[in-house]
Amino acid sequence: MNLTLEKIQQRLMSSDDLKTPLYIADKNDFKRNITDFVAAFRKYYPNYNIGYSFKTNYCKEFINVVKEIGGYAEVVSPKEYQLARNYGFDDSRIIYNGVIPDLGNKIRCAN
């Protein structure tokens, strides 16, 4: 499908069924941006990898791209941890952290 800005605007203005928040993104651009970002860091830090924040946006299409390139799921809650597991991330590919860490949940996730 060839979407232009005009077509997107027409669709948004003529629709009563769209809900918010609404994200308009190109999965190929997203993948290219992440891949380029990782490659730039690996020039200087060969073991670099990326962790994608589920808190920011846990849209499955974005998460699948991160998983496809070997990135990590970065989660801060039991709900996000379970989403990462549901989306196929192994525990070894999940970073569990946060501003106010809950030690009990971290221990449960580690087991």
Spell out what each predicted region is.
Residues 1-111:
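A charged N-terminal "starter" segment
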